[in-house]
């Protein structure tokens, strides 16, 4: 039975565009933009106007789902509030008022109530005259007519999803989330909690034509439940995770989720058996509501931010200038005096998924002219390779720059390996070079066209080197561990290295022009030639200048320590230095880039535009153990207190879409290729922005020790081109 005209409720759901919501505005923006909730989200306002109100004798409470309808209207589903009737409210978001109510009944007209229907998920179907509503009690997904609220049909639910003892689901932990794609062809039903035996994993069922066709594995953050989904299309979703801790309050986080290339886990008895991270849906944080400005909100119980409450509903709204979208949230007060029915309005940036555009591979055994190398290595065979080696291997690339200044095509490159075999005591026969290479993304091959040798014929290096008594004084991996490379405004090259750490300047042919420049703050690594007897190293081994960016005009360098200094109490800090090329000195200015976890390192950096930097953040794992390989955007001009830089994840290199099959056909046992492409190589150490939103990424293969792509086979050097929408 409905208390509004049939036309009112049906018309309200005829389309799914929500217009602007007139809510309490967030505090005015000032320096630092206090409305910001993060790099891709800001709070536009909130409203408590619906809290503890009634409509036509019903309590407006327990609103657990929000489905967009026509104009400024949305439909809100009530959960199990006592013995009251199950119902859907027609909410005018602009006026912050309920305009109508539809009571949900069985096909025979008998009412559903809070005792037998726990409404949690709601979507409006294509016609606008029917809705699908999920109930946690059984669980179920039922179709109702909006005109009279009568049940029309129900969708099948796999038996194991039934609440125990009939199935493996826990009470009140079932279909909390329900979403449909913009074309209404796909429906997603998400489990708030795990099935018995799934550990902490959640399942999302994919329906097509009213039938379940597959299941996805999803991980929430610890102690959080999956309470809502928004389907964006193209296998992309938004996921709302929510939790509550007594005496502390709520946690509310929204993630961008990708199902690209995700496998069907219907036949997996327990999600705890999934060892490959690619078997789980990928997710990136869009907004943590605790980071939004309180904006005058009040809470009726302890909260880490008074803006927070039991948010359970989410709906995507209209487009805003600048490409952002409105995102509406609603909290469920559970009919409690200590909770609030609150509407939120956010502006969010939802970027399209990153796509693989090109891939070129240089064989691990593409030995180059030069003396036999690897003579100091253990002669045992590693990944099918036995030292010594017939010439000079290319052990991947730790830095890649254009072969010609200003070229952004990615077709002609100057690519630099590091010190060879990883240590001073095993790399004396590895010559330091930068190779001129032409990757061919059509044939997936790399043409090595020549190289420049780094050398010190003018004796600028003040400490002993391996080839000290030769004419050319070719530099080796026992002299420097070169990791980053930049070209200045004169065409000279600057090498960032890790033994010092030093900055080393050469001319365009590789000849050293001046003594290496040490850190301005006295920092030294254990391998530093400058380390005095008894002096304590403050830069860990192999944690020097792995990354270095250069300004567009070539006059400023930004070398970055790969890891934290040993004397730094903040082990997540990675120091960004500033070096004035014209003055030939450090400026004394530094910034702090904070990695997500102390174990993570900075692999490389490059300038995007102005003083905006693109960095590699990575773990030290490879293959299926790889968890963090990502590109992060920051801006030196947007540094906060104490020079701490903002950060935004631009792309997860473990989750790149490959719709065109660039990475296929797969080689035998090759990991990480196909519709979902991954870059699971241990040392992702080169990043180069190209034209538009394209980025080139390459790896150091730690020859011959890495086998992240094909187990038991030494990793090749891979150069990939990725299209990253919204990069800049």
Predicted regions located by residue number:
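Sequence/structural signature of beta-propeller domains
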Residues: 32-728
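Secretory targeting and sorting signals
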Residues: 1-31
């Amino acid at each position: 039975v409905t208390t509004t005209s049939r036309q009112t409720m049906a018309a309200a759901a005829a389309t799914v565009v929500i217009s602007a919501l007139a809510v309490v505005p967030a505090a005015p923006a000032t320096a630092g933009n206090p409305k910001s909730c993060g790099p891709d989200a800001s709070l536009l306002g909130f409203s408590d106007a619906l809290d503890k109100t009634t409509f036509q004798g019903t309590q407006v409470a327990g609103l657990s789902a929000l489905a967009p309808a026509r104009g400024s209207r949305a439909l809100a589903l009530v959960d199990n509030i006592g013995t009251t009737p199950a119902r859907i409210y027609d909410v005018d978001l602009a006026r912050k008022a309920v305009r109508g109510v539809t009571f949900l009944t069985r096909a025979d007209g008998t009412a559903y109530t809070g005792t037998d229907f726990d409404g949690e998920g709601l979507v409006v179907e294509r016609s606008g005259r029917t809705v699908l509503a999920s109930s946690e009690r059984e669980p179920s997904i039922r179709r109702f007519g909006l005109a009279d609220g009568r049940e029309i049909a129900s969708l099948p639910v796999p038996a194991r999803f039934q609440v125990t003892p009939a199935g493996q689901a826990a009470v009140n932990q079932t279909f909390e989330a329900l979403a449909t794609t913009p074309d209404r062809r796909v429906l997603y039903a998400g489990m708030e909690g795990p099935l018995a035996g799934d550990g902490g994993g959640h399942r999302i069922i994919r329906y097509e034509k009213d039938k379940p066709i597959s299941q996805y594995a999803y991980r929430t953050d610890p102690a959080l439940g999956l309470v809502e989904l928004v389907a964006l299309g193209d296998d992309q979703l938004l996921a709302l995770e929510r939790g509550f801790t007594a005496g502390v309050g709520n946690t509310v986080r929204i993630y961008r989720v990708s199902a690209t290339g995700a496998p069907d886990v219907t036949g997996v008895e327990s999600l705890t058996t999934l060892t490959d991270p690619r078997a789980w849906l990928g997710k990136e944080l869009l907004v943590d509501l605790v980071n939004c400005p309180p904006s005058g909100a009040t809470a009726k119980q302890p909260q880490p931010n008074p803006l927070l409450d039991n948010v359970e509903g989410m709906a995507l709204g209209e487009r805003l200038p600048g490409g952002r979208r409105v995102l509406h949230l609603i909290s469920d007060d559970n009919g409690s005096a200590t909770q609030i029915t609150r509407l939120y309005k956010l502006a969010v940036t939802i970027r399209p998924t990153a796509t693989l555009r090109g891939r070129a591979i240089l064989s691990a055994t593409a030995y180059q002219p030069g003396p036999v190398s690897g003579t100091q290595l253990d002669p045992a065979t590693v990944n099918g390779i036995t030292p010594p080696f017939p010439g000079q291997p290319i052990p991947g690339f730790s830095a890649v720059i254009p072969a010609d200044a200003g070229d952004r095509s990615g077709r002609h490159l100057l690519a630099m390996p590091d010190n060879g075999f990883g240590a001073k005591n095993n790399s004396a026969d590895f010559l330091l070079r930068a190779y001129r290479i032409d990757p061919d993304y059509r044939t997936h091959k790399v043409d090595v066209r020549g190289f420049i040798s780094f050398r010190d014929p003018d004796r600028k290096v003040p400490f002993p080197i391996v080839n000290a008594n030769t004419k050319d004084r070719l530099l080796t991996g026992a002299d420097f561990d070169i990791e980053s490379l930049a070209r200045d405004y004169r065409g000279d090259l600057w090498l960032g290295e890790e033994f010092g750490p030093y900055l080393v300047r050469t001319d365009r042919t590789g000849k050293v022009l001046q003594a290496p420049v040490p850190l301005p703050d006295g920092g030294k690594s254990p391998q530093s030639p400058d380390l005095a007897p008894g002096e304590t190293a403050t830069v860990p081994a192999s944690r020097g200048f792995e990354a270095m960016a250069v300004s567009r005009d070539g006059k400023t360098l930004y070398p970055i320590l790969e890891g934290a200094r040993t004397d730094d109490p903040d082990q997540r800090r990675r120091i960004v230095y500033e070096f004035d090329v014209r003055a030939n000195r450090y400026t004394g200015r530094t910034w702090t880039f904070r990695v997500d976890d102390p174990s993570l390192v900075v692999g490389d950096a490059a300038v995007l535009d102005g003083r905006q930097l693109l960095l590699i953040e990575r773990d030290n794992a490879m293959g299926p153990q790889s968890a963090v390989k990502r590109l992060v955007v920051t801006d030196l001009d947007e540094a906060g207190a104490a020079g701490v830089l903002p950060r935004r994840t631009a792309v997860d290199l473990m989750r790149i879409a490959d719709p065109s099959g660039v990475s296929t056909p797969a080689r035998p046992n090759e990991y990480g290729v196909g519709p979902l492409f991954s870059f699971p190589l241990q040392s992702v150490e080169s990043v180069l922005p190209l034209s538009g939103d394209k980025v080139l990424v390459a790896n150091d293969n730690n020859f011959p020790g890495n086998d992240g792509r094909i187990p038991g086979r030494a990793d090749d050097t891979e150069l990939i081109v990725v299209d990253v929408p919204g990069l800049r």
